[in-house]
Each structure stands twice: as C-alpha cells, then as structure tokens.
Amino acid sequence: MVLTGVTSKAIRKGDAEPPLSKGSFRVYNMRFCPWAERAMLYVAAKGIEAEVVNLNVTDKLEWYWTKHYQGKAPAVEHNGKVVIESGFIPEYLDDAFPETRILPTDPYEKVQQKLLADRLTAVAHAVPLLFAVMRDRTLKDEKQRKVFEVLKQAENLLANDFYAGSQPGYPDYLSFPFFEKIWWSASLDGVVDLPTIEFPGEEEYPKLTKWFQKMISSDVVQSVTQSLEHGAAFMNAYATHQELNYDLGL
C-alpha cells in the first residue's frame, strides 16, 4: 500500500486546492473521524496508491463545497470524479479497482456481508453515548450498560476470526473505526469501564478481544490510525465543545 500525506497537516478555509495530476487518486480525510477512517482503511486494504489531504472540517474550505455538498470527509477523487459518503465509497472502490476486490462477487455472499456491516452500525450508534458521559460523568452507569449490550451483540455476530471470514473484509473495515472510538473512550477517566489493554475484555468478549487485537495490529490499520492518547484527547475535546486541534500529534 502506498498512501502519501497521511500525516500532513489539515488544510482550512483560505488554503488553495492542492493540484491533482491526471490519473492520480486522492482521499479527503479527517484524521479523527471514524466515517473518514472507513474510506482510508478500504483504500489501504486495496493497496491503492493515493494522496491523502487532511481537512479542518470546522473552518471549512470554500472550494471543497464543490466536492462535498456538506463540506464533510470522506471523499475520494479520481480522474475528475468525486465520490462521497463512507457507505458508498467502498463499493465504488471495488468496482473501480476490481483486481483487489474486497466484497464478494457472489450476489448472495455480497448481501450477507453488507447485512452484517449494517447490523454492526449499532457500534457507531454507541459512540454518542460516550460523548454524553464525557460531558456529564453522572451518566456513566446508564450509558455504559447500553454500550456493553452493543458489544455483546457484536461478540455474538463474530462467527469466524473476522466478520468477513478468515480474513478482514467489508464488515470489518466499516465497523472497526467505531470499536476503536470506544477503545479511545476507555482510556479517559470515568467514561466507560473497559480495559485499554486486551480491549474490550477477554472475560466478557473473548472473540471480540482477539478480533480487535488482530485488527489494531494489522498493517492496514496501522497505516491510517491515530494513537490512543491523541485519539482520546480529540474525542474529549469534540464532546465537550472545546477548540479542536486537527493537527494533534503531528
């Protein structure tokens, strides 16, 4: 995999659009956004040579509105065409670069993996519960019960080493960023009672713990992810409405 610009500083309102040479592939990213990380993981897993442009999505770029009507990340650009939304980008990438296809070509198997990814969106919905606790620690017991339920459901859905089977695939790459955000939250004092080492816990979630360790240590994830320390700090700042440092850790 060849990703350049992963650790580049975020561009913001007033910055010029970086030139993109013909035939080049670009990912517009926000380093701490789980939705953007979905696209980054998929690009990395497919081994696409890509330039990464990190964005400040608070102080939005004027010209970026022509790429994404909401000014959000992620977006991918290739040969003058822009595709947005983390739920659509993976399928586009599989169709545009079929030689490294991740989703199965068999119609039935493809639908099964998409359904599994859809069921795992419950993990994404758990993240805002932790934002609420970051703002008010008295909500911890109430919110973490719901998080634990979601993790148990995810544990029960894991029938193999990975959600896609013997190797990580579509449901793994689309769900991992949200498990990671729960892991980040676990490192903050008083937010959720989960370990950061052997996350989310071998006793309660043995299959999920092995899965997470395999994912977090993989070359694909390591090529795009942020550290536990910086990720947790950014999450806390976002949840508590502090000024956001999009270049944290650079």
UniProtKB/Swiss-Prot annotation:
Top-rank taxon, per record: Eukaryota
Active-site residues, Swiss-Prot/TrEMBL: 33
Keywords: Cytoplasm, Oxidoreductase, Transferase
GO-annotated biological processes: detoxification of inorganic compound; glutathione metabolic process; response to oxidative stress; response to superoxide
Domain GST C-terminal: 106-234
InterPro entries referenced in this protein's UniProt entry, alphabetically: Glutathione-S-Trfase_C-like, Glutathione-S-Trfase_C_sf, Glutathione_S-Trfase, Glutathione_S-Trfase_N, GST_C, GST_omega, GST_Omega/HSP26, Thioredoxin-like_sf
Domain annotation GST N-terminal: ranges: 21-101
Keyword GTP-binding: no
Signal sequence annotation: none
EC numbers on record: 2.5.1.18, 1.8.5.1, 1.20.4.2
Localization terms from the record: Cytoplasm
Subunit annotation: Homodimer.
UniProt record similarity statement: Belongs to the GST superfamily. Omega family.
Name of protein: Glutathione transferase omega-1
Organism: Caenorhabditis elegans
Gene expressing this chain: gsto-1
